């Protein structure tokens, strides 16, 4: 008789413990039910990127001194810098600068180590194309400023916290 009572007490304690665990899990689930949905309707809604977002690289041709620091610090030696030495003024003159965004890993080393700050990251992240050769940007394509997501009136912007 005593054995049967202790088994019943152990069984009831296990039932109470299981009900408590189920209740805790249910409370966590219900606390998430009050949150707003995270999904956005992409072409019509866009997320405002953070201040430190690493998007497409912007290049300012006039500031570049063709020092090739960006090529040396790039982990994949990606930027292609063509220059010519001007003998009369003994300085390098930049002829061409290009980056292939199909290969770029957007690490930001080129921007961080550039001595003249001619490179900067933009908030542009829409780089998809049907032909991968279109992702090879020369100095003219790198020089154009992207359309700001905030300034585009056709798109509803969403701030994610």
UniProtKB/Swiss-Prot annotation:
Q: Which is one Gene Ontology cellular component term of this protein?
A: chloroplast thylakoid membrane
Q: Which domain of life is it from?
A: Eukaryota
Which positions are annotated as binding [4Fe-4S] cluster 2? Answer: 74, 104, 107, 110
Q: Which reaction does it catalyse?
A: a plastoquinone + NADH + (n+1) H(+)(in) = a plastoquinol + NAD(+) + n H(+)(out); a plastoquinone + NADPH + (n+1) H(+)(in) = a plastoquinol + NADP(+) + n H(+)(out)
What topology in the membrane does the UniProt record assign?
Peripheral membrane protein
Question: Which GO BP annotation is one of this protein's?
Answer: photosynthesis, light reaction
Which function does this protein serve?
Answer: NDH shuttles electrons from NAD(P)H:plastoquinone, via FMN and iron-sulfur (Fe-S) centers, to quinones in the photosynthetic chain and possibly in a chloroplast respiratory chain. The immediate electron acceptor for the enzyme in this species is believed to be plastoquinone. Couples the redox reaction to proton translocation, and thus conserves the redox energy in a proton gradient.
Which cofactors does this gene product need?
[4Fe-4S] cluster
Keyword Iron-sulfur on entry: yes
Keyword annotations from UniProtKB, A to Z? 4Fe-4S, Chloroplast, Iron, Iron-sulfur, Membrane, Metal-binding, NAD, NADP, Plastid, Plastoquinone, Quinone, Repeat, Thylakoid, Translocase
Q: Which InterPro entries match?
A: 4Fe4S_Fe-S-bd, 4Fe4S_Fe_S_CS, NADH_quinone_OxRdtase_chainI, NDHI
Q: What's the protein here called?
A: NAD(P)H-quinone oxidoreductase subunit I, chloroplastic
Similarity annotation: Belongs to the complex I 23 kDa subunit family.
**One term of GO molecular function:** NADH dehydrogenase (ubiquinone) activity
- Gene that encodes it: ndhI
Q: What is its EC number?
A: 7.1.1.-
């Amino acid at each position: 008789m005593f054995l049967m009572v202790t088994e019943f007490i152990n069984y009831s304690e296990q039932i109470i413990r299981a009900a408590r665990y189920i209740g805790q899990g249910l409370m966590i689930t219900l606390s998430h039910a009050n949150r707003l949905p995270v999904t956005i309707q992409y072409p019509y809604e866009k997320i405002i990127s953070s201040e430190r977002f690493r998007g497409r690289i912007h290049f300012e041709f006039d500031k570049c001194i063709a020092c090739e620091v960006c090529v040396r610090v790039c982990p994949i030696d990606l930027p292609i810098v063509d220059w010519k030495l001007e003998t009369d003024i003994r300085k390098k003159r930049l002829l061409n600068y290009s980056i292939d965004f199909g290969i770029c890993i957007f690490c930001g080393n080129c921007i961080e180590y550039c001595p003249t700050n001619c490179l900067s990251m933009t908030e542009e992240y829409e780089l998809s194309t049907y032909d991968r050769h279109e992702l090879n940007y020369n100095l003219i394509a790198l020089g154009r400023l992207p359309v700001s997501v905030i300034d585009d009136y056709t798109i509803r912007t969403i701030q994610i916290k």
